[in-house]
């Protein structure tokens, strides 16, 4: 008793110190139904993106979709259930106007992040085509991203050569498929990434797409602080 033994109860609490705000800009043009990924480009992306979202517990995420125009699917939120539900509901025909407006998709994403006070602001922009629609030039949108301190990772999605893609509509409303050349403006995507301090990736199949999102996940790590508390229980009791 004179030695006054102590019993230590040690507990740990993790406190998030610096979260990241991430907007995923997704091309939803009809070509995203091409079957060079399984079962098609869009569904392959949704599966990989869902895993990515689940791996970011400390960050806020948002979704933007674009084809000939763009709009916000979900604003920045820490509610992963909401983001995953919105991701699952994305279809090629949610935006009626056809085409691929990369500049619009990027500009809308910048708009979602410009007021953010996060220590790191990131856009992951994915497309399977070339910029052929919209009234905002992709380079102008890139300059806006730089102005607001936003890094852009770009992903070109699609195999090399020809891909089985929608070429018309049948009377029953289903797409007719045919072999179509894969055309991705890689030079533009590389320029966007380089201008904003990000990286460009090319995904030619499902596994490569998964590897790319894993790589971005490693590059953009959330910083956390760990606090340890020690509670002492005095073994000695005075008489």
Positions of predicted regions on the chain:
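C-terminal signal-anchor/stop-transfer transmembrane helix together with its immediate cytosolic
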Residues: 1-12, 222-239
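VWA/integrin I-like adhesion module and closely mimicked acidic/polar interface patches used
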Residues: 96-100, 122, 129-195
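Short, hinge-like loop/turn segments at secondary-structure boundaries
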Residues: 79-82, 170-173, 218-221
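Short glycine-/polar-rich loops that comprise or flank the Walker A/P-loop
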Residues: 20, 58, 148-151, 196-198
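Solvent-exposed loop/turn segments at secondary-structure junctions
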Residues: 30-31, 68-72, 129-132, 158-162, ...
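Membrane-embedded segments
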Residues: 4-120, 136
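Extended, hydrophilic extramembrane loops/domains of integral membrane proteins
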Residues: 189-220
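Structural recognition of the beta-strand scaffold that forms the well-ordered cores
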Residues: 24, 64, 124-125, 151-156, ...
């Amino acid at each position: 008793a004179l030695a006054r033994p102590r019993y230590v109860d040690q507990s740990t609490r993790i406190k998030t110190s610096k979260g990241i705000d991430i907007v995923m800009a997704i091309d939803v043009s009809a070509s995203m139904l091409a079957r060079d990924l399984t079962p098609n480009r869009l569904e392959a992306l949704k599966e990989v993106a869902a895993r990515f979202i689940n791996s970011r517990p400390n960050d806020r995420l948002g979704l933007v979709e674009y084809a000939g125009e763009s709009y916000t699917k979900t604003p920045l939120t820490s509610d992963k259930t909401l983001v995953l539900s919105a991701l699952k509901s994305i279809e090629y025909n949610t935006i009626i106007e056809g085409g691929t407006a990369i500049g619009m998709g990027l500009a809308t994403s910048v708009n979602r992040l410009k007021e953010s006070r996060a220590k790191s602001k990131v856009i992951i922009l994915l497309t399977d085509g070339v910029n052929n629609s919209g009234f905002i030039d992709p380079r102008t949108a890139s300059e806006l991203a730089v102005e607001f301190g936003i890094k852009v990772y770009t992903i070109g999605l699609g195999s090399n050569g020809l891909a089985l893609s929608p070429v018309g509509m049948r009377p029953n409303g289903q797409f007719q498929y045919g072999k179509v050349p894969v055309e991705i403006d890689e030079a533009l995507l590389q320029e966007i990434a380089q201008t904003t301090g990000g990286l460009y990736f090319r995904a030619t199949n499902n596994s490569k797409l998964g590897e790319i999102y894993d790589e971005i996940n490693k590059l953009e790590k959330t910083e956390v602080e760990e606090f340890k508390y020690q509670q002492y229980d005095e073994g000695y009791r005075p008489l």
